Amino acid sequence: METVSVEEGLDFAPGMVSQKCLLCMCKLESGGCKPIGCRMDVGSLSCGYFQIKQPYWIDCGKPGKDWKSCSNDINCSSKCVQQYMKRYATHYRCPLNCEGFAREHNGGPNGCHSSRTLKYWELLQKIPGCKGVKFS
């Protein structure tokens, strides 16, 4: 599959999550869409552009060489997000828009329906260029 570059140097994998939505999620997760390595988050390590935890990487099909290197590679990590959404967003009948995907990413399986992921969506909407992001 072909990748789409939304900003110089950022080649997101294609899929059901729009490139704009991936960019907004990436900016929120890594403070500007950067390969920031791993850090502790709610008792376990979260890594890379999308702050992917190991169970998330396993659930997305273990793309790439390993969890940490995939998380710090923009194409591999965005492929993981796309595959995770293909697996869970449809299964849990999440809204197939940026809000549904962002909340599912933040909250895990069925996170799109959890009130605890609303704050994440509100934070994403405050990122310049991300307010009102739907599909494009």
From Swiss-Prot:
One MF annotation (Gene Ontology) recorded for this entry: protein homodimerization activity
Disulfide bonds: 21-98, 24-130, 26-33, 38-47, 60-80, 70-76, 94-112
Function according to Swiss-Prot or TrEMBL: Bacteriolytic activity against Gram-positive bacterium M.luteus and thereby probably protects against bacterial infection. Also has chitinase activity. May act as an ispopeptidase, cleaving isopeptide bonds between the side chains of Lys and Gln residues in proteins or in the cross-linking peptide of peptidoglycan in bacterial cell walls.
Reaction it catalyzes: Hydrolysis of (1->4)-beta-linkages between N-acetylmuramic acid and N-acetyl-D-glucosamine residues in a peptidoglycan and between N-acetyl-D-glucosamine residues in chitodextrins
Designated name of the protein: Invertebrate-type lysozyme
pH dependence comment: Optimum pH is 4-5 at 40 degrees Celsius for chitinase activity.
GO cellular component entries: extracellular region
Temperature notes for this entry: Optimum temperature is 76 degrees Celsius.
Pfam families per the UniProt record, alphabetical: Destabilase (PF05497)
Presence of keyword Signal: yes
SUPFAM superfamilies assigned to the protein according to its UniProt record, in alphabetical order: Lysozyme-like
Quaternary structure note: Homodimer in its autoinhibited state. Active as monomer.
Binding-site list for substrate: 53-59, 84, 92, 105-107, 119
Keyword Hydrolase among UniProt keywords: yes
EC number(s) on file: 3.2.1.17
Signal peptide stretch: 1-11
Record domain I-type lysozyme: where: 14-130
Source organism superkingdom: Eukaryota
Location, primary (coarse class): secreted
Residues the record marks as site: Cleavage: 134-135
Family listed: Belongs to the glycosyl hydrolase 22 family. Type-I lysozyme subfamily.
